[in-house]
A protein has these predicted regions:
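C-terminal motif of bacterial Sec signal peptides marking the signal peptidase cleavage site
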Residues: 23-25
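Bacterial N-terminal signal peptides that target proteins for export
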Residues: 2-15
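Functional-site microenvironments in short loops/helix caps that host divalent-cation chemistry
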Residues: 56, 138-293, 300-302
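A short glycine-rich, aromatic-capped structural motif
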Residues: 41-124, 157-161, 257
């Protein structure tokens, strides 16, 4: 079997696992279920500097170079941050409320007519569906607020368009796949440069939030739950649950598990966008740095979030 077809089979398997787990999670919504509240001490305004240079890309460890310095958010964008953005963007007209959805303008992609390619013309596209029971945002009295307890959890149920619009608002952007992978793996310096996980060569239940990892949020049954606060796996003890400090070599947290992360690449001949990092609903093997998934840019899920680069 060629590497190309083996890679396709792995991607199909990952997609099927995500779909199956998503169906399992779609029980009766209990949006009022109490959520454990822990202070991780995360400074969600913090950025990590990543210098130009080489790193090992992919499962087959190909040396690749990025020719520019850049920065990425240390933590995933939170519900609290996204609510503040929506209030500003709604006031300035950057986004609009239409039939219980948040939409915004996108300039469109070049359409090349490839098989299965979907045309994305200039126009308004879905950012967030406000009536989804998995969403932890509320719109009351002309303002967005966060459902209590979810303020510092990663923003989820946001499409690629909605993630990109957040970054654009502040003159940032979504990271490319290569930028994301280097931030997760670290430099080509001979010190575990081929690590499969952001923190090293092995994974334990105390490293990240993934399927059956037994964190304090694992038993929550309401649809859309089971994310952990950003930066949760920082070496602290929460009740009886002791975490391992699991940042990447550049100091980024949640680069494996919790939620899949949108990346910014727009590839020719296809409309799909790519996600990295695995999530609370995937097995530990899908938290390896090189694992990719894809979805239409209008896709949203309780297991998908994002962070920005600049």
């Amino acid at each position: 079997m060629t590497r190309k077809f083996a890679s396709i089979r792995r991607l199909l398997f990952t997609t099927l696992v995500m779909a199956a787990l998503g169906m399992c999670a779609c029980g009766p919504a209990d949006v009022g279920a109490p959520v454990p509240v822990y202070d991780t001490g995360a400074d969600t305004t913090e950025w990590a500097s990543i210098p130009a240079g080489e790193f090992l890309e992919g499962q087959h460890e190909t040396a690749v170079s990025i020719d520019h310095d850049y920065e990425m958010m240390v933590f995933l964008v939170t519900y609290e941050q996204y609510a503040a953005y929506l209030n500003d963007a709604l006031a300035t007209g950057t986004v609009r409320l239409v039939d219980n959805t948040i939409v915004g303008h996108y300039p469109g992609d070049e359409f090349r007519g490839a098989r299965h390619e979907v045309r994305i013309d200039p126009g308004d596209y879905l950012h967030v569906a406000l009536n989804d029971p998995a969403l932890r945002l509320e719109f009351r009295e002309h303002a967005f607020t966060v459902t209590p307890g979810w303020e510092v959890h990663p923003m989820t149920m946001v499409t690629w368009f909605g993630a990109g619009a957040y970054c654009d608002q502040y003159d940032w952007r979504l990271p490319t796949e290569l930028e994301w992978e280097k931030a997760a793996r670290g430099p080509l310096d001979g010190r575990e440069s081929n690590r499969p996980f952001p923190w090293g060569s092995e994974i334990a239940r105390n490293n990240a939030n993934y399927y059956a990892s037994r964190d304090p949020f694992e038993s929550m049954s309401s649809y859309g739950s089971r994310t952990t606060p950003v930066g949760f796996y920082n070496g602290k003890i929460y009740g009886a649950f002791a975490t391992i400090d699991s940042h990447s070599p550049y100091g980024l947290y949640d680069m494996a598990g919790n939620v899949w992360q949108w990346t910014g690449d727009v590839h020719p001949f296809e409309h799909y966008r790519y996600l990295r990092g695995g999530s609370k609903d995937t097995y530990d093997m899908d938290l390896r740095i090189w694992v990719r998934n894809s979805a239409a840019p209008t896709y949203a899920s309780p297991g998908v979030g994002f962070r920005c680069a600049r």
